[in-house]
Amino acid sequence: MKSVIFGLQWGDEGKGKITTYFSKDYDYVVRYSGGSNAGHTVMYEDFKVVHHLLPSIHAKYEVGAIISNGVVLDIEQIVLEIEDYISRVGRIPNLCISNLAHVVLPQHKLFDGLLESVKENNAIGTTKKGIGPAYADKVHRFGLRLADFEVDFKEKWNFISHLYKKLYRIEVEGYDGLLKAYEKIKRYILPHVEIIDLIEQNNVLFESTQGVLLDLDIGTYPYVTGANCNTTGIQNGVGYPVKVEKYMGVFKAYLTRVGNGPFPTEAFEEEGENLRRKGNEFGATTGRPRRCGWLDIPLMKYAIKVSGATELIMTKSDILNGFDKIPVCVEYEINEERVSDIKSVVELEKAKPVYEYFKGWESHNSQSFLDFVNFLEKQLKVKITYISIGPKVDQIVKL
């Protein structure tokens, strides 16, 4: 069995918890895109783990973790995560890392921050973790891979340092730190063909980062991440034409966004602050407050279409417990015309939400909540199979 769990919104949908919950049914969880800009928080009964690069494996089961070639790896960060995992869980994770994964360098992080600062009002609002610059150098064909540490690391480091000095006037230290970090993760690194063998021969759960609407190609460009975090990124992200059977799309019962970009259903002032406070909507990676708003049906339809979602999982419905009424955007008004489907996310800049209001609920057992779920299924034409009813990994209900 090959399945994928991915976000249908702008990230922060609760994919980490959902992936962890289902990971016990698989041999490996595979991260295929992104970098340390991801923040997947998993809460157990007695401790919490935040994954930035480590796949969201269940700490209480023997599940393997694979970081594939599509990930850009901050090797100093992964060392910290492994150490933190060991201290909390009490054992070393069964981790395999592709030797073809590219490395995030100190130059990338510094350049990321500088680029945001000079953009001023056009800034994207990145995490400044160097993800975009690392992918850019990969495309420019002077990126550094894990495999290069065993061949000509010093020569490549000097070349990259020379380029950044000449092109951007950026000079940083980092050679010794990278070497030390590499030595600590060397035991986990495998030739990529062996990664493919593991994927071929086992039941695998692919774990996406961010969300479909942040995908480099079909997201709300330019306010996107540097990677293909849609399900279409799996093939490139593992370097193998894998066949996926289940596409599990995760969405929150409301909507959030970090950074800049269009957000038609954004709630402001007291309304937005109430959602942010109740949902604890602060970034796991940066701590930044998330922009909060209401569920957006036209945008969900778009995300489902481009991702191929075969089933849906709703999270954080419990955050809306006790609300008198729940707004849901069912249509947009664009250029004085009503539309229920969008052809392109470019249209979002002009979109004004048209809301339908639903009676609030006290719990997931309330009839008003079940009516809400039935409405969503009719609108989206995809079955909602599970709902998350709390922050802990086992607080999930099958419908």
UniProtKB/Swiss-Prot annotation:
Binding residues annotated for Mg(2+), in chain numbering: 12, 39
Residue sites binding IMP per the record: 12-15, 37-40, 127, 141, 210, 225, 288
Record GO terms (molecular function): adenylosuccinate synthase activity; GTP binding; magnesium ion binding
Keywords: Cytoplasm, GTP-binding, Ligase, Magnesium, Metal-binding, Nucleotide-binding, Purine biosynthesis
Record's catalysed reaction(s): IMP + L-aspartate + GTP = N(6)-(1,2-dicarboxyethyl)-AMP + GDP + phosphate + 2 H(+)
Record: residues binding GTP: 11-17, 39-41, 290, 316-318, 388-390
Free-text cofactor note: Binds 1 Mg(2+) ion per subunit.
Predominant cellular place of this UniProt entry's protein: cytoplasm
Gene Ontology CC annotation, any one: cytoplasm
Active site: 12, 40
Pathway(s) this gene product operates in, as recorded in its UniProt entry: Purine metabolism; AMP biosynthesis via de novo pathway; AMP from IMP: step 1/2
Annotated compartments: Cytoplasm
EC number: 6.3.4.4
Highest taxon, organism lineage: Bacteria
Positions with a binding annotation for substrate: 284-290
One Pfam entry name: Adenylsucc_synt
Subunit structure: Homodimer.
Family to which this protein belongs: Belongs to the adenylosuccinate synthetase family.
Function: Plays an important role in the de novo pathway of purine nucleotide biosynthesis. Catalyzes the first committed step in the biosynthesis of AMP from IMP.
Name listed for the protein in its UniProt record: Adenylosuccinate synthetase
Species: Thermosipho melanesiensis (strain DSM 12029 / CIP 104789 / BI429)
This protein's encoding gene: purA
